[in-house]
Amino acid sequence: MSDSQFLTAHGRFEAARRLPRLDPGHPAHGLHGHGFQARVRVPAHALPARPGAGVQELREGLSQALRPLQYADLNRLLAHPDDAALAQWLRERLGTASAQAAVELRSTPAQGVAGDPGGPWLSLRRHRFLAAHYLPNVPPGHKCGRMHGHGFEVELRAAGVDHATLDAHWAPLASRLDHVLLNDIEGLHNPTSEVLAAWIWERLRPGLDSLHSVSVLETGSSGARFDGSDYEIWKEFGLDSAVRVRRAAAGSPPARLHGQTFRLRLCLSAPLDRVLGWVVDFGDVKTLFRPLFDRLDHRPLYEIEGLDDTDTATLADWIFQACRAELPQLSGLRLLESDGCGAGVHVGAATPP
């Protein structure tokens, strides 16, 4: 399968709105406000930017599109400015990239919408529960074999339903999962993130046929997603590096020696191990990535042999190719700069990170 490169940008805006189509007693019917967050993703070829400047061009395009929304009364722009209407409004203002742009808009960290080009808007809702667990099938001495626990987060995505509907479907499961030992629940004898995501899917899908995916986050840097057929996990790493973009315009800030704090997400997809119940052990991902991590973290990246340049898109592709031998399950990666903008790669039809 071919690899596809993409660019991504992130932005924020503060705005007020009323949602008049909701029942008068609904809290969002009246005037209120949010700190919105928006993320867009486009294929790298969708922007006619000079080499090495794609991330900056998308960043500037998103910033310009968001400018009319900053500190605005959104009802002056849209009659019913819910998350989906705002996301569609934003997509239409991304210039040449609009037709190929995937957009995610969150009105709060726990709710929003996401949509790929030509697809429906998916409502997304995130819930949290506190639970203990242990993994009985790991090798002796593995830390996950000990009794421990997490503040788990679960993100549900579904088409054609609102956030209240997702909440209603989630509520019965929340009461079963919160403040318990997961291993005591039928079907969760070996409660890995992947097994838990599939367990939740199996209980929600019969009553929610538009369910798109279930993601389970054990920590802020790792998680698993199940869409009814495929499993994917991710593990994130922080990199602090020195960069200098050789192809940038002479005298411009990117051309100068400077620093960058990157956030790298590695995504891996494979059938579950029947005994261990995971795609790959998160700890193994960390161990196998460690030699490459040591070449990137607290290093001058412009000195790496074989790395053509240190712009984020070039660097993301180089890391992807460098990882494949040790991590054959790699399905994609995303490399973000300090402000949340960046680039990535995904394999074939795999969901971009």
Predicted features by range, described:
Residues M1-P353:
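Charge-rich, low-complexity N-terminal segments
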